[in-house]
C-alpha cells in the first residue's frame, strides 16, 4: 500500500522498517525503502507523494518504487538469494519487459563502451549492484533535482580536464552542465553514502522512473510523446514565482544568468532555469525530468561515433520533440550548456 506514511529507520535495521503509532511494521511487501547512514527523512514526504531523504549537507533523493511482485518478475521470481549470472540476466530481462514501452526497442542498451567513465569490469559490477539493490529493496533513490552547483554557473568545460565544482542535489542551484558523460559519472560516483553506491542511472533505471510515474497517474502519451506541460521546454509557457530561483537568458552576446523569479514567459524562447525552479515541473517529488538540461545515462547507442545517451530533453527543445522518455545521442567529448546529469543511489 503506497498510501501509508513511512518513517524510515537507520541502518542496520531491515530496509523499509518503519515506526507507525509506536509499532514497528514493514512499509510494504513490494517496496522497502531504506535510510542510508547519515541521511534523514524529509518531513511530510511519503510513498504517496514521493518519499524523500537528505544527507547531512542537504542533498535530497526521492524513492522510485519498483514493486517486487510476480507481475514485475515473472521469469526471475521472488526468491532469488544467490544472484548468479543467470539470475541477474533474468532480473534485467524482466525489468526490460516491465518498462518495454519506454525502451525504444533494443537500440539503446545498458552495455559497456570505453567512453562511459568506467572499466568494463567496473561497469558490469555496478550494474549487478544496481539490479540486486532494486530487486531486494523494491526500488532505488534518484536525485530530487538535476545535479547543480551552488557557487556559480559553469560557462565552459573541457573533455580532457575533470571539472572541480562541487556537485549538489538541491533546489535553486545552477545546473551542473558543460560535462561529458564520463565526467558526469565520475562526479556522480563520489556522492555515495556508506554502503550504498551513487552513479548515473542505467537506462533501465530511467525507464523504471517512467513506469513509476505511469503508476502514479501520468499517461504514456505524456511520458513518451509530449511532455511539454511538465518541463522547461522552448515551447512551454509558464509563470515562475520562486524568488530564490535563477534563469539564463540566451540572447546572443547579452546572454547571462539573472537571480530572481523569471515571471511570465509569453512566447517560445530559450530560458535555462536553476534546479527546481517551479513546482509545475515536479512529478512525485522529482523535479525537471522533462526539459531544462538533458541528462547523461550509462546507456550505449551502439554507434561508434556517438555512443553516449542523454535523456529527458532540454530547454532549447520542444516538449513534443524531446519528451521525458526520449533518447538523444552524443559523442564522448560532447559537453555544452544543455547537457547535465542526475544521480541515483542504490
Which residues does each predicted region cover?
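GGW-centered surface loops in extracellular recognition modules
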Residues: 16-74
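Acidic glycine-/aspartate-rich tracts in secreted/extracellular proteins
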Residues: 13-14, 67-71, 146-149, 298-304, ...
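Disulfide-stabilized, aromatic/cysteine-rich ligand-recognition loop
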Residues: 20, 178-192, 197, 201, ...
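Active-site-proximal beta-strands of protease catalytic cores
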Residues: 290-299
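Short aromatic-cysteine micro-motif
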Residues: 57-58, 86-288
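Conserved "repeat-terminator" motif of extracellular CCP/Sushi domains
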Residues: 1-16
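Short, solvent-exposed loop/turn elements at domain surfaces
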Residues: 70-78, 149-155, 318-321
Amino acid at each position: 500500500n503506497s498510501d501509508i506514511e513511512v518513517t524510515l529507520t537507520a541502518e542496520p535495521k531491515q530496509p523499509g522498517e518503519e515506526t507507525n503509532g509506536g509499532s514497528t511494521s514493514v512499509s510494504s511487501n513490494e517496496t522497502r525503502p531504506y535510510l542510508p547512514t547519515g541521511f534523514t527523512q524529509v518531513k511530510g514526504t511519503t510513498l504517496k507523494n514521493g518519499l524523500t531523504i537528505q544527507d547531512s549537507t542537504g542533498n535530497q533523493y526521492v524513492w522510485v518504487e519498483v514493486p517486487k511482485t510476480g507481475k514485475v518478475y515473472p521469469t526471475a521470481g521472488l526468491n532469488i538469494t544467490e544472484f548468479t549470472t543467470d539470475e541477474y540476466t533474468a532480473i534485467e530481462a524482466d525489468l526490460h519487459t516491465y518498462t518495454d514501452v519506454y525502451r525504444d526497442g533494443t537500440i539503446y542498451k545498458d552495455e559497456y563502451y570505453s567512453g562511459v567513465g568506467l572499466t568494463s569490469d567496473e561497469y558490469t559490477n555496478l550494474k549487478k549492484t544496481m539490479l540486486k539493490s532494486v530487486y531486494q529493496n523494491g526500488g532505488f533513490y534518484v536525485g530530487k533535482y538535476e545535479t547543480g552547483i551552488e557557487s556559480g554557473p559553469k560557462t565552459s568545460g573541457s573533455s580532457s580536464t575533470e571539472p572541480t565544482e562541487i556537485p549538489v542535489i538541491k533546489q535553486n542551484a545552477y545546473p551542473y552542465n558543460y560535462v561529458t558523460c564520463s565526467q558526469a559519472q565520475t562526479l556522480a560516483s563520489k556522492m555515495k553514502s556508506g554502503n550504498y553506491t551513487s552513479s548515473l542511472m542505467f537506462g533501465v533505471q530511467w525507464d523504471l522512473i517512467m513506469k513509476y510515474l505511469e503508476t502514479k497517474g501520468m499517461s504514456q502519451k505524456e511520458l513518451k510523446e509530449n511532455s511539454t506541460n511538465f518541463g522547461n521546454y522552448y515551447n512551454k509557457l509558464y509563470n515562475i514565482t520562486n524568488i530564490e530561483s535563477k534563469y539564463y537568458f540566451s540572447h546572443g552576446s547579452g546572454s547571462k544568468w539573472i537571480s530572481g523569479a523569471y515571471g511570465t514567459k509569453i512566447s517560445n524562447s530559450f530560458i535555462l532555469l536553476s534546479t527546481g525552479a517551479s513546482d509545475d515541473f515536479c512529478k512525485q517529488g522529482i523535479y525537471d525530468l522533462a526539459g531544462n538540461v538533458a541528462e547523461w545515462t550509462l546507456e550505449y547507442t551502439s554507434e561508434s561515433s556517438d555512443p553516449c545517451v542523454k535523456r529527458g530533453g532540454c530547454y532549447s527543445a520542444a516538449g513534443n520533440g524531446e519528451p521525458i522518455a526520449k533518447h538523444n545521442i552524443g559523442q564522448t567529448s560532447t559537453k555544452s550548456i544543455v547537457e547535465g546529469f542526475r544521480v541515483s543511489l542504490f
